[in-house]
Amino acid sequence: SLATEKDKNGHQLNFFTGNFDFSDDKQKAILIGFQQQDESLYRNTFLGNISPITGGFITENSAAYIYTGIEWNVDLGGMIFTPSFAPGLYHEGDGKDLGHVLEFKSEVQLSYETSEKSSFGVSYNHVSNASLGNKNPGANSYMFNFLKTF
């Protein structure tokens, strides 16, 4: 399984592309990004396997987000369900004004193991400032993911 595989190999890179803020016709934009997960720092808890993540993305409108947080890996027998939470720093560039530099990303991902060290997945996230700013429009995004374990 992927969870056992990652225990032995150390870390995983997730390369993704998708549609940033797809629910806002005026602000939606193509995004590309990456995420690194260090399995050597994982913790088995009553919630499952939790490990740290760090990553970022940029949109076609030069908006950028860098983050660090945690993810849970739930092995569903060939499929992996991965919810995550990550605070980060957002720069709007020519893209959407999310109301604050500090934003929080909540995400769910479902991936399928295509080989011992590779998976493909789909994910959905919501980025929001939790009302820290004067406005909090948020952004909903979906992505297609390629995950490689090293």
Language-model regions, residue ranges each:
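Residue-level signature of outer-membrane beta-barrel architecture
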Residues: 36-38, 72-74, 112, 126, ...
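N-terminal, post-signal-peptide region of Sec/Tat-exported proteins
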Residues: 28-58
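Solvent-exposed loop/turn segments connecting transmembrane beta-strands
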Residues: 20-30, 56-67, 94-101, 131-138
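Helix-adjacent hinge/juxtasegments
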Residues: 61-85
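Outer-membrane beta-barrel "beta-signal"
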Residues: 28-34, 137-150
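Mid-chain, well-packed structural core segment of small domains
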Residues: 79-106
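Transmembrane beta-strand segments that form the barrel wall of outer-membrane beta-barrel proteins
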Residues: 11-21, 47-59, 82-91, 123-128
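Short loop/turn motifs that connect adjacent beta-strands in outer-membrane beta-barrel proteins
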Residues: 2-10, 24-25, 40-50, 75-81, ...
